């Protein structure tokens, strides 16, 4: 692979990695809100002991769980992109020798 192609791919991967990290930061903020809401709903459910409060808790917890799944996916993407970036950097070093 030519040096210029490696550099282009490295730039692309770096930009994608930055975007995914920004998305993760935003998701973490949203996740905190959903987790807090689920915890509040759980406490209300325990205190009120009504079916409606329990359903509200379950719904809030589903949202928090969905955020956790999304976070795991983003972390996986970050790991893949980081590995690709490392591989490209290794190739760049080898091609410059």
PLM regions with names:
Residues 27-52:
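Extended alpha-helical coiled-coil "stalk/arm" regions
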Residues 1-17, 89-97:
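Short, charge-rich amphipathic alpha-helices with coiled-coil/heptad character
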Residues 11, 29-32, 54-62, 78-84:
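Short, charged, amphipathic alpha-helical segments
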Residues 21-24, 63-84:
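Amphipathic alpha-helical coiled-coil segments
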Residues 3, 24-31, 75:
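Amphipathic, non-membrane alpha-helical segments in soluble helical-bundle scaffolds
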Residues 11-16, 22, 26-29:
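N-terminal acidic leader/helix
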Residues 47-70:
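Short, glycine/alanine-rich amphipathic alpha-helical segment
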């Amino acid at each position: 692979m030519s040096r210029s192609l490696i550099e282009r791919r490295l730039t692309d991967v770096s930009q994608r990695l930055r975007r995914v990290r920004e998305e993760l930061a935003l998701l973490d903020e949203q996740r905190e809100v959903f987790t807090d809401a689920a915890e509040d709903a759980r406490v209300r459910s325990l205190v009120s002991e009504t079916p409606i409060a329990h359903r509200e808790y379950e719904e809030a917890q589903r949202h928090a769980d969905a955020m956790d799944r999304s976070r795991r996916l983003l972390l996986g993407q970050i790991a893949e992109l980081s590995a690709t970036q490392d591989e490209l950097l290794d190739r760049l070093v080898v091609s410059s020798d």
